[in-house]
Curated annotation (Swiss-Prot):
It comes from Aspergillus fumigatus (strain ATCC MYA-4609 / CBS 101355 / FGSC A1100 / Af293) (Neosartorya fumigata). PANTHER family: WD REPEAT-CONTAINING PROTEIN 55. This is WD repeat-containing protein jip5. It is found in: Nucleus, Nucleolus. It comes from the Eukaryota. GO terms for cellular component: nucleolus. Residues 371-383 have a biased composition (Acidic residues). WD repeats lie at residues 9-48, 73-112, 118-159, 222-263, 319-356.
């Protein structure tokens, strides 16, 4: 399925990762408060003059991954990132108590939101930022708050207050997954979403608030993703939310039946409990491998679970010591995994007769673009803040498995 990987070294621990919805762009948020945005080579541009596709530069080892921009965005760590639905804006949230909206292409800040403080007046650090639509931004925090902001309200020097605040869980929100819009939707944007927090799952509606909270699952729920197009039958409509737990088990939840899980898949069994399933992503249907989920583990591996048979069919290793924090697929079907101080870009397998001489141990890699930390400009402050800066102190992150990761080159075998 994939057999090539490019490794991008980072200057600090990765705390957040986001993939552009329309272009081959990946952004990372670091423990130092830096945000850096990379552009991956586009295979669409690699065509002959007569329109026939040539061997992609991203496959033959001659492509470049370029740093579009890099800046010190937050005084503390950058805990979360998310692109707007059209990819024009990049939202970041940090332990400095700020959410910043910047142009994805340039990194220039256009808006700021002050996160409401905790009850004791301290910073209520963010856990998730998600643009639900062009009008609505969702922000979750350590105190279990879920704030909803109307992005149509013009920027004001006065700190914007959320239009709504909910508390769907007793603990901080660990994941947020939007549900697809209904058939009667006129906007085409989601108005409901699933969250996990502590040992429960909840569904919240844009207008009606928290609709339902599940029974106590007696296990910490860590990650979630929606998948449709599964085989329908009986009471199943072929739509499920997949939830990753802290003990190595995936639970399957039928859409609309949120009281309790209906199936379990053991991904990582170990004596005394499995490994935490930190992040989930749906493998694109275009890759032709059927319905499949990629699971990023706290142990540094990525496992692939085929739906239907509900079992692990393959595994690759992102890093042998650091957990997988970010996982997703870009617009061209490449898997991007992040954790520790590295980001890896995995490519779909290429037939052996397409391979050229530019290989390393049978695996090709990109040439390095302008992504060296040495190329960082002298002004390391936020684009919108030109005043003096104090040195940022990285703050403790909720997730485990932080630290320096290896920077080796790895490949993996086909998934059939």
């Amino acid at each position: 399925m994939f057999d090539t990987v490019c490794t991008l070294p980072l200057s600090a621990d990765l705390f957040s990762q986001a993939l552009h919805p329309k272009e081959p762009i990946v952004s990372v948020g670091l423990s130092t408060g830096h945000v850096q945005t990379f552009r991956l080579p586009s295979e669409e541009s690699d065509t002959d003059n007569d329109g026939a596709e040539s061997t992609s530069s991203s496959r033959n080892g001659k492509g470049h991954i370029d740093t579009m921009w890099r800046t010190r965005r937050h005084k503390g760590s950058c805990r979360c990132l998310g692109f707007g639905v059209d990819g024009e804006m990049l939202y970041s949230a940090g332990t400095d108590g700020l959410v910043k909206a910047a142009k994805a292409e340039t990194g220039v800040v256009e808006n700021k939101i002050a996160i409401p403080p905790a009850k004791d007046g301290s910073v209520d650090a963010p856990t998730i930022v998600h643009a639900l639509s062009p009008q609505t931004l969702l922000l979750a925090t350590d105190s279990s708050a879920l704030h909803l902001y109307d992005l149509r309200i013009p920027f004001s020097p006065v700190s914007a207050r959320p239009q709504q605040t909910h508390h769907p869980h007793d603990d901080y929100i660990s994941s947020l997954t939007p549900l697809p819009p209904s058939d009667t939707s006129t906007s085409g944007f989601s108005k409901q979403w699933v969250t996990t927090g502590g040992t429960t799952l909840a569904v919240t509606d844009l207008r009606r608030g928290v609709l339902v909270r599940s029974e106590d699952q007696e296990e910490e729920l860590v990650s979630s993703v929606y998948i449709g197009g599964l085989r329908a039958g009986g009471t199943s409509r072929g739509e499920k939310v997949i939830v990753g737990g802290s003990s190595g088990v995936l639970t399957l939840w039928e859409k609309g039946a949120w009281d309790d899980q209906d199936e379990r898949i053991y991904v990582q069994r170990e004596a005394g409990g499995g490994e935490s399933l930190e992040t989930l992503a749906v493998v694109p249907d275009e890759l032709g491998k059927g319905k499949m989920i990629a699971v990023g583990l706290g142990s540094g591996g990525v496992k692939f679970v085929r739906m239907g048979v509900n079992k692990v069919v393959s595994e690759v290793m992102h890093d042998e010591t650091e957990g997988v924090i970010g996982l997703g697929f870009d617009v061209e079907g490449r898997m991007v995994s992040g954790g520790g101080q590295i980001v890896k870009v995995w490519h779909e397998a290429v037939d052996s007769d397409e391979m050229d001489g530019d290989t390393i141990g049978g695996k090709r890699m990109f040439g390095s673009g302008s992504d060296s930390d040495d190329s960082d400009d002298g002004d390391d402050s936020d684009d919108s803040d030109r005043g003096s800066r104090k040195a940022a102190q990285p703050q403790r992150k909720k997730r485990k498995n932080k630290g320096k990761g290896g920077q080796d080159i790895m490949g993996f075998a086909d998934i059939d």
